[in-house]
Amino acid sequence: MITVSPILYAATPSAWHALAEAVGLVPAFPPDATWSEFVADGGLAVHGVAPDDPLSGTTDLHFLVDDLAATETSLVAAGFTAEHTPLDDVGDMLTVVIGSGARVTLTQPSSPPPAPTGPLAVLPIWYQPDLAEPRRLLEALGLRARLSADAGVWMDFVADGGGLVGLHRDEHVSFELSFEYSADLDALAERLTTAGYAAAVVDEAYNRTLRVATPDRSDLFVNGRQDDLYGYTRHDGAPA
């Protein structure tokens, strides 16, 4: 089993904790300024850093797996190399770096993550020019393709332990935190606005998206579930 659990580096972690809960994530334990974890369909970790830290405002693509050794075996069989790093209170961490320089990490938690629940799913987006190698890596990890754009610019994947990952063709390599919401997006926007956040639902070419201002003065995207499949193909990982 594998769970999508990106790591967000935040210079204002308490503000991010509040936003995470307002969007619909639930703290796994009382948040603190250094490290906090939240759960929904998938997970999110918030790592507090100094304002001048180059990592501030960035996101790492991280996964939780139930068998790290078996995961490494699958990666090696698919042609990837995993580097081991021992971490205090965590154990071994696997790091995979692909040809574009994009870096993915994996750890094995001491107890299984909660089962996916609720309408909010974690959906980190992986941007890079060529999507073939990221797709091969995600499939080696056991994620299943859900939707792909016929134009080849987008593909997303579902993890059996919770969460989604989107691949988006772009000239730059980066990861971005986002979410998918399968319930009433307008009602979520109203709740966020009532809580004091600048939030609005906009009509994109592919779907409706909620944009909410973050503590980093950027926008967090919460996508509505995509039901209009014109120009898209549904794959085996999509729910019936």
Question: What kind of region is each of these model predictions?
Answer:
Residues 2-12, 38, 50-120, 125, 148-150, 156-166, ...:
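Vicinal oxygen chelate
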Residues 15-22, 75, 101, 134-139, ...:
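Conserved active-site tyrosine of GNAT-family acetyltransferases
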Residues 34, 68, 130-131, 153:
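A generic "binding-loop/recognition-motif" signal
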Residues 21-28, 79-81, 139-146, 197:
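Conserved acetyl-CoA-binding loop of GNAT-fold acetyltransferases
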Residues 24-59, 102-110, 143-179, 212-229:
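Conserved short beta-strand elements that form part of the metal-binding/catalytic scaffold
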Residues 1-18, 59-61, 107-136, 140-144, ...:
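N-terminal beta-strand motif that seeds the catalytic metal site of vicinal oxygen chelate
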